[in-house]
């Protein structure tokens, strides 16, 4: 036993040397790994093997990065592009950054609806699936074979039998679809793929990199993107969670092209195939007479561990820094890195009304403890923090100055910014932003406000626990 522990300790020393001198991570993450590998050697060893290897990360994504670049050039020939030099807008710098970081096209001929509950969203999804004539492309983190999951699978299977192209891509960890349901879909002519499959569901050396996207695209006429996964719990049927509060979008118009491009790249990678299909049918002609008459500026921005730039984080950062009057944020998990935390503090210190809403009852208790460790710094700067008490808050939204907002799959945490595959829509429109604000203030009615006075009264044990877990927060 002593020999085993000594071997683990020596291997951990090699890991630490690699982290410091080869991987050259940021100081926060480096210290977190040093602490856990030194003081919890066996646990640290296991966690590092599963979650920590940047060298393995580079190996995993080297082919994907090269393939995506090649395929992206091909996809661009089918997408609508605008000359950004001619755009004169309040947020031109953000638009330019998103374009340069993620090749994200700025489009205006869009119509966007917001959904704040799963009942209406799932009804709309099924209705649109039933109207499909050419193709249905679906990419989700969690997909369950429960009541609502089976309804959607039945709708997909029915369309596949009718000759509609059906492609369903799910994450290997989030997938809970029964094999018999998958077999029915395949027998009907549908196609099903798992993103980053492992030896078995929970033995996967790539477990750290999750496809957290929630995308549905139908005939390039309509698309859905947001925070809802597929399962009964999102309808509030899980008694342990209760009401599920989330935000999702329904998109019509040219913004769908970038979302379709994102799906095709992910599908191609999971399928280990080239884009050797007729792509014209997947993209909207920018000169089509069927485009929405509304003018709603939008960009689809995606990020993941296969990129050196943290695109969605950078977009959030620009929105925070641009805010002049108010900034309203909803996120289920709050683990900002130091630059993001400082940006929020500086916004509050500058007189911006910064309101951050988090779950009062986190689904993972330790994530609540980590979030708590950032409260004092924000409260001292003048930011306001609210805990949502009516069930579970899962929305991932940010709104600034009633003029710009972002909705999608990315939480405001280090994992979403650097380790998960995420997609958000950035919306440059006052009407949509005000609708988001209205919902934020509705949610405030069922929130408890965290005050500095009440927060300082927490127990010594809570303070010690928060301080300890804060040390490893960069790994969460």
UniProtKB/Swiss-Prot annotation:
Which BP terms from GO are recorded? cardiolipin biosynthetic process
Q: Which residues form the active site?
A: 212, 214, 219, 394, 396, 401
A GO CC term attached to the entry: plasma membrane
Where in the numbering of this chain does the PLD phosphodiesterase domain appear? Answer: 207-234, 389-416
Chief location: membrane
Q: List the Gene Ontology MF annotations in alphabetical order.
A: cardiolipin synthase activity
The family assignment reads: Belongs to the phospholipase D family. Cardiolipin synthase subfamily.
Q: What function is annotated for this protein?
A: Catalyzes the reversible phosphatidyl group transfer from one phosphatidylglycerol molecule to another to form cardiolipin (CL) (diphosphatidylglycerol) and glycerol.
Q: What is this protein called?
A: Cardiolipin synthase
Q: What class of enzyme is it?
A: transferase
* SUPFAM superfamilies, alphabetized: Phospholipase D/nuclease
Entry keyword Transmembrane: yes
